Amino acid sequence: VTLSYVWGLGAKFVCVKNNLKRLSNPFGLQVFWNELSPTIKDAIILTQKLGESYLWVDSLCIVQDADEEEKTKALNDMGRVYDQGLLMICAADDRCPTDGLRGIITPRKQRYYTSKLSSSLALAASFDLSDYLKLSTYETRGWT
């Protein structure tokens, strides 16, 4: 599963050379859980609810202070990563990127249409997604 989202100002936690070894250990991300943005936390929870084990997040899977050549290669591979993922979680609501994914932790009060995907997960929509995306910052990004 991949996460495509707008970072927002001052990303709380990213992968850097200093924490790479710790993050590479099994369950290494648990140590940093409180430092993760709500959007990333919600995407992790959603990935688990989908029954999947892996989530690719650019801020955590690309070493942000890597040398230029390594970082350029990683950035050039992003299209392939998104294309070959099982599915992409698209967090296109850029009004407040730190709010997380609506409806993952707290139930939504808005009326919406649902399609049940599993016993614990439903897909919901209350608007025409294509019109919504045209107006978002997310739509201006190169690999979406």
Which residues make up each language-model segment?
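Fold-level signal for large, globular catalytic cores of enzyme and receptor domains
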Residues: 1-143
